Amino acid sequence: MLPNQNRLRRREDFAKVYAKGDRYRGTYLSLKILFDSNTTYTRIGIVVSKKVSKLAVTRNRFKRQLRAIFRQLLSQLKDGLQIVVTVTTVASKPNYQELGDDLKNILAKAKVLHGN
């Protein structure tokens, strides 16, 4: 699990990121990233719609895998970010490694990792 301070939960927060954030796309994921100078920590929300899979088991697996990947990357992310991750509809179901590689590539492209 992600720590409570790193979770994006409220509808208003998601709406703000969707409206004002910059979009970055990868093979399996789409990210909306908004820099918020008012916070000192990064907050993350994950969205997996029923278009990806009608089965809740599959949608929840994607969310668990992405939370685990973000937990490892949290120390490498810059502070004050609000990130909404959306799993895009895909013909093939990506495994954990493919999701991790795709997410790292998108974050590097967005220049939100330390050292970028």
Swiss-Prot record:
It holds the Pfam family Ribonuclease_P. Transmembrane segments: none annotated. It catalyses: Endonucleolytic cleavage of RNA, removing 5'-extranucleotides from tRNA precursor. Keywords: Endonuclease, Hydrolase, Nuclease, RNA-binding, tRNA processing. The keyword Hydrolase applies. PROSITE patterns: RIBONUCLEASE_P (PS00648). It is an enzyme of class 3 (hydrolase). Gene3D superfamilies: 3.30.230.10. It comes from the Bacteria. GO terms for biological process: tRNA 5'-leader removal. The keyword Hydrolase applies. InterPro entries: Ribosomal_Su5_D2-typ_SF, Ribsml_uS5_D2-typ_fold_subgr, RNase_P, RNase_P_CS. Consists of a catalytic RNA component (M1 or rnpB) and a protein subunit. RNaseP catalyzes the removal of the 5'-leader sequence from pre-tRNA to produce the mature 5'-terminus. It can also cleave other RNA substrates such as 4.5S RNA. The protein component plays an auxiliary but essential role in vivo by binding to the 5'-leader sequence and broadening the substrate specificity of the ribozyme. This is Ribonuclease P protein component. The lineage of its organism: Bacteria, Bacillati, Cyanobacteriota, Cyanophyceae, Pseudanabaenales.
